[in-house]
Design a protein with these regions (language model features):
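The feature captures the beta-strand-to-loop junction immediately N-terminal to the Walker
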Residues: 64-66
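Helix-to-loop junction immediately C-terminal to a conserved catalytic motif
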Residues: 79
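Conserved ABC transporter NBD signature motif
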Residues: 87-95
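Conserved signature/switch motifs of ABC ATPase nucleotide-binding domains
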Residues: 109, 162-165, 183, 214
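Short coil-to-helix segment of the ABC ATPase nucleotide-binding domain corresponding to the Q-loop/switch region
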Residues: 125-133
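Conserved ABC ATPase signature
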Residues: 163-167, 171-173
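Catalytic Walker B motif of ABC-type/P-loop ATPase nucleotide-binding domains
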Residues: 188-191
């Protein structure tokens, strides 16, 4: 009886450990006690207070808040574009808060796609070239072909060879979004990505992003 009970206890413990490992491995991003303060003159303005966040692979979350509530600051922190005043950020089981800018940049380049409401396209590059450049810099095979496939999904097949100045605001934003996900990042951070789009295009972009996450 003792040996059976002991075996049961050991098995239960092993199962519990195994489940915890699975849960930990499936966590893509983790924030622990994140605080962010900006200093303006003699005052410290607190933007984020004790933020805890867990995002699992293939999970979609929305951060809702008033203007100035810190949503964009949160994206900047997660994307490694800014450092927290205190707290820790883990990406794929690696703490990134203590890494150098170059190390964080390397992680971001390969694993994180950021879509800002305000974006920049290279003026003298066509739509295809703007997207393909990201792939070229990361040694993708056939970057032009991949860029065209992606832009086609965004309804821009007829705009492949147009410069940004020849595109509407909504079309420019679609190019910027296509560029952000061209590397097939593990994590997409979107700061009001459809803010400049009409209803029809907003729905199309949202559906594409959700489909991408499921894939």
């Amino acid at each position: 009886t003792f040996s059976i009970a002991l075996a049961f206890m050991c098995t239960r413990k092993i199962i519990k450990i195994f489940i915890n490992i699975l849960l930990f491995m499936s966590t893509l991003l983790k924030l622990k006690k994140i605080n962010l303060k900006y200093q303006t003159g003699k005052d410290n303005i607190s933007v984020l207070k004790n933020v805890d966040l867990n995002i699992k692979k293939k999970e979609t979350i929305s951060v809702v808040g008033e203007s100035g509530s810190g949503k964009t600051s949160l994206i900047m922190l997660i994307g490694g574009l800014e450092k927290p005043t205190s707290g820790k950020i883990f990406f794929q089981d690696q703490e990134i808060t203590g890494l150098s800018e170059d190390e964080v940049s390397e992680i971001r380049k390969k694993n994180i796609g950021i879509i800002f409401q305000s974006f920049y396209l290279i003026p003298n590059y066509t739509a295809v070239e703007n997207v393909a450049l990201t792939l070229e810099l990361n040694n993708f095979k056939n970057p032009q072909k991949e860029a065209k496939i992606l832009l086609d999904r965004f309804g821009l097949k007829h705009r492949f060879n147009n410069l940004p100045s020849q595109l509407s605001g909504g079309e420019q934003q679609r190019v910027a979004i296509a560029r952000a996900i061209a590397m097939k990042p593990e994590l997409i951070l979107a700061d009001e990505p459809t803010g400049n789009l009409d209803t029809e295009n907003s729905i199309m972009i949202t559906n594409i992003l959700f489909k991408y996450v499921k894939e």
